[in-house]
A protein has these predicted regions:
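Extracellular, repeat-based ectodomains that mediate carbohydrate processing or recognition
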Residues: 1-172
Length: 172
């Protein structure tokens, strides 16, 4: 087992996701800061054998002031098809978290534009047009069914003590 360089602990603590595609290609997603306690970006790395890994590639929005956390990763039906979800506060404050989605069809060389999944500004007292107050990132999952449909569920709420809710969406 090897430590991933650049995966220093920040405020949100480390979290990582792993998926293996139909050809055995391995991808990991994780968040890391440039220094301990700094806002963290979302990165991916991939490997054909689990022994050698590509350099990390940033897949979040590139800002040094945005917190990114809690990745979820799933493999699609074809080699190189991976789907990534995570939560970040790019909409301006720590009370404006959202759940984001990106997809690659070529093993991570290129990615779709980030799609905001948590785009409902109502339905709960902790939601605004900008996002939700607090991410329950340890309650985030992504799966791909036999037809290639992506399914995502996540938790969000008012604070780490609640109340909160679970939200679900699906799509290609």
């Amino acid at each position: 087992m090897n430590q991933i360089p650049g995966s220093d602990v920040g405020f949100l603590g480390p979290s990582v996701a792993l998926a293996v595609d139909s050809a055995g290609g391995i991808m990991i997603a994780y968040h890391a800061g440039d220094s301990p306690g700094a806002p963290q970006k979302m990165y991916i790395r991939d490997s054909a054998d689990g022994l050698t890994w590509t350099e990390r590639m940033e897949v979040s929005n590139g800002s040094f002031t945005v917190n990114n956390a809690f990745p979820g990763l799933a493999a699609g039906r074809t080699p190189g098809d991976f789907r990534l979800v995570w939560q970040d506060d790019r909409n301006g404050s720590t009370n404006a978290w959202n759940t984001w989605y990106r997809r690659t069809a070529n093993g991570g060389r290129t990615w779709s534009q980030a799609l905001r999944l948590s785009d409902l500004g109502e339905g709960a007292p902790y939601k605004t047009e900008a996002g939700y107050f607090f991410p329950y990132g340890d309650y985030l999952e992504i799966a791909v069914d036999g037809k290639g449909m992506t399914h995502v569920i996540w938790g969000e709420g008012l604070s780490y003590t609640g109340p909160g809710g679970s939200w679900y969406t699906r799509g290609r």
